Amino acid sequence: MTVFAKRDNGKGARASRMVQSGAIFALAATTYLVSPQIAQAQSYRFDQVAIEGNQRIEPRTILTYAGIGRGEAVTAGELNDAYQRLQGSGLFEKVELKPQGGTLVIAVQEFPTVNVVAFEGNDRIKDDVLQGLIKTQSRKIYSPAAVEADAALITKGYSDIGRMAATVTPKVIRREGNRVDVAFEITEGKVTEIERLSFTGNRAYSDRRLRNVLNTKQAGFFRALVQRDTLVPERLEYDTQLLTDFYRSRGYVDVKVKGISSDYTRERDAFFVTFNIEEGQSFKFGDVSVISEVEGVDPAEYEKQIKIRSGVTYSPTAVDNVITRMEGVALKQGLNFITVEPRVVRNERDLTLDVQFVLTRGPKVFVERIDIEGNTTTLDRVIRRQFKTVEGDPFNPREIRNAAERVRALGYFANADVQTKRGNNPDQVVVDVNVEEQPTGSFGIGASYGADQGVGLNLSLAEDNFLGRGQRMAVAIATAGDEQNNSITFVEPYLFGRDLQFGINLQNSKSDNSNAFYQTRVTSFSPSLTFPISEQGRLSLRYTLKSDKMFNVGKDENDDGNYTGSSPILKADELVGSQLTSGVGYTYSYDTRVNALDPNTNFKFSFGQDFNGLGGDIESIVTKAEVIGQTKVMQEEVTLTGQLQGGAVTMLNGGRSRLLDRFSGNGLIRGFEAWGYGPRDQSHSLTVSDGLGGNYFISAKMDAQFPIGLPEEYGVTGGLFMDIGSVWGLDDTAGVGGAEVDDSLIWRSSVGFSIYWTTPVGPLRLNFSKALMKEDYDKERNFDLTVSTKF
């Protein structure tokens, strides 16, 4: 291209100066050249500027980009600048600057309009998904740079699903009317899996243990179903953070993931990924103290917030929890702008860290406002209630970070970014919350199997963010054999804007147990309120209205309803007919998994009672308690679990308990069938002897889960277990012919081994058990398989 300009010599003579087109096109390669023949000091003047070739772009827009007005003196360099601005605008395919006498003609050829965007060769990713990745759209202006960028985005999209060999070639087809069709020709290639995940530098933990920490998985038996066994750079970055957090929570404060290498296999169809770790040493807490650098603040009042003991493995989470509690105490005392700074002193000799919590006065900065963007469905208040800080409160960076984590933990957003910026005044900040919505509803079609119920079908429809209010609504239908259980659940997690959970549960069930000759039907309605009463303790209050009925006692529904005979205890339950139960109850739970100080040891305790008799037919007190403890040993390769449960039903005002009121013992002791142990009418005149359940139960279960030498990508581990317990106690022990039914406490126990198989469609467990302590009339089961799945 050649640009001619009229030189300002006072006589109107024409002089030509050439700006080489190669110099101008070199701008695209970020190199700017100017012909040495042009003297930058020379100036030119155009009386008029004419525009040619524009169809959609307004002349004023072109003049604005050119920056040359009528009668203005311009240099050759300024002409170059005008060209570059026009060409760099992305609006024109070609640009020419042509002088004609005293007129500068700007001739442009606009980029064509995109007529159709098409994708060819794509099977794994559908057209609508690919269209959402790219910028080029129908009826928009065609841009070569944008099309190339879109090809790269499509390639990345395939890379994210493990198809590293995918190639994308854009094709542009010219059409009449200055239009083009853009086609992306895609060669998807094969999935490039991660064949092996390995580690170097790890001495404290095995590769097997560290692989369980990672979000990325290595290809295994179900490689066709697993989506996390492909090489995704962003996922590996997340894995780096997971590894770092894992080590630091176990006292390795100096841990570093020094690098990640990914190498092709010899066949170039998979990757070997290796994490290079520098562990360092594991530290424990040394001396832990608190001092105050704020006049008038007594540190003794804050010492009780220290829940850390010397000699315990160092954990950043434990330190953060103490800081949060101390700053909360300061706020309750009306001490604003008090911050807690942890000062750590290393003791290399004994590998301890002395932590001194220092109360200091921070800068007086206030929160001007909290701006929330990106929430197209979720209401602002759902996000805002995750912040304990409101407009006008003192600014606390740690609280803002904690609030950001709470927003992410909701599960409503694919991404949640929380940043702060300066407000209108130097002592104010604005908190910007930018979220990206993600689907929160789910439809589940599931299958289940149990030795008692056989094969079952489960249907569920759930919405975790109902109407964008943060509420949960779920409908579930479960069938197994002749049993059916339907339920509707609604949960409002923040009633009245407080940490007060309100729930309603409606349930209807019908059972025809294949191991017993009777049927039951239960319908219940139960609203509840749950709220925290301590950092790790919660209290749940509930009301329950229930109608239940027992019928067809002693009739074999599989044999045309013939009467087989049954215990008079069960016949009495049938004679009372449908019964209404109305009562209130509570459950207190204490769970150390909330803000856990030790990641390897967890403890949960719960105790609850139901007081029935607020109207209805049943007057009773039902009490249940449970303790569960879990720890990991042998470099966290072996998981030990212990569980202790107990319960009691106390009938009031001389009432007798029915089978529907008593405990069945199902699942408490492995090695026995449902209703397979406990009181039983053993009269020889009965064709069938059904279990009667008991007013009391106790159970202790001990499990050990460990690797059995198989590659962990198979997801198979082994386990040993031992159970002991009993179900006992009846209000009416008169059996057939007045014979006494033995309802005393008789211990049962069993041992066995388990095979755990974690599959992409759900966890599967096979139990092989042997009853050790039993009665002759007990019904044993030596094998049990359970699986629960969604697909």
Regions found by a protein language model. Give the residues of each.
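Outer-membrane beta-barrel "beta-signal"
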Residues: L461, G585, F753-G762, E780-F791
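Transmembrane beta-strand segments that form the barrel wall of outer-membrane beta-barrel proteins
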Residues: F387, T420, T440-Y449, L457-A480, ...
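Transmembrane beta-barrel wall of Gram-negative outer-membrane proteins
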Residues: N486-S578
